[in-house]
Structures are given as C-alpha cells and as structure tokens.
Amino acid sequence: MDNSPPPPSNESPPPQPPPPQATHTGSPTDFLKGVVGKRVIVRLTSGVDYRGLLSCLDGYMNIALEQTEEHVNGVVTNRYGDAFIRGNNVLYISAAEPI
C-alpha cells in the first residue's frame, strides 16, 4: 500500500467563515441601562478617554464616573475619585468588559 500524500489539487481551500460580529439587537438605551454600575470607556471629542464605573447619566449624555482614570494616547495621566463629564463632549461610551 502506498502511504505517499495525495497529489496537490487545483481546487482552492474552502473560504473561512467571517469573524463573529456583535449580535446585540437591543437599542442604545438598552445598552446604556445595561452598563450603569459597570466599567466603561468614555471617549471625548478631544480624543481623551475616561475609564471608570458608570454611576449615572442623563438624556443629555452628562455622565458621572467613579474610580476614574484619564487616558491620553493610551497612557494614564490622572486618576479621579469621581468625574463628571458634560454630554456635549462625549463622542461615545463603550463597555470596558463584555456585557
């Protein structure tokens, strides 16, 4: 019996499945309600990130964070016990850990 490998085929390998994408179907309001009390990243329009526990927010996107770290270009530049961010400066809010 011949144990040599089969000859190469001219067929290309099957395509890889696409990477998994977020499958959250809830509304932005549902997301924001779900991250209250959890660690979040708040990106400002200036490019500065604030990371901390989302204490509360209002309809204007005014945000209160606890145990807050300020990140500029990925480097921690300040730490605050509490931070209050005016909503018109907020570019986005993301969960710092899977929800």
Curated annotation (Swiss-Prot):
Region feature (Disordered): 1-30
UniProt entry keywords in alphabetical sequence: Cytoplasm, mRNA processing, mRNA splicing, Nucleus, Ribonucleoprotein, RNA-binding, rRNA processing, Spliceosome, tRNA processing
Keyword Magnesium annotated: no
UniProt xrefs under SMART domains: Sm (SM00651)
Record-annotated Sm domain positions: 27-99
Keyword Nucleus: yes
Compositionally biased spans, kind Pro residues: 1-21
Major localization class: cytoplasm
One GO BP annotation of this record: tRNA processing
Subcellular location(s) of the protein: Cytoplasm; Nucleus
Family assignment from sequence similarity: Belongs to the snRNP Sm proteins family. SmF/LSm6 subfamily.
Subunit structure: Component of the heptameric LSM1-LSM7 complex, which consists of LSM1, LSM2, LSM3, LSM4, LSM5, LSM6 and LSM7. Component of the heptameric LSM2-LSM8 complex, which consists of LSM2, LSM3, LSM4, LSM5, LSM6, LSM7 and LSM8. The LSm subunits form a seven-membered ring structure with a doughnut shape.
PANTHER family membership: SMALL NUCLEAR RIBONUCLEOPROTEIN F SNRNP-F, U6 SNRNA-ASSOCIATED SM-LIKE PROTEIN LSM6
Function statement: Component of LSm protein complexes, which are involved in RNA processing and may function in a chaperone-like manner, facilitating the efficient association of RNA processing factors with their substrates. Component of the cytoplasmic LSM1-LSM7 complex, which is thought to be involved in mRNA degradation by activating the decapping step in the 5'-to-3' mRNA decay pathway. Component of the nuclear LSM2-LSM8 complex, which is involved in splicing of nuclear mRNAs.
Name of the protein: U6 snRNA-associated Sm-like protein LSm6
Organism, scientific name: Laccaria bicolor (strain S238N-H82 / ATCC MYA-4686)
Chain's gene name: LSM6
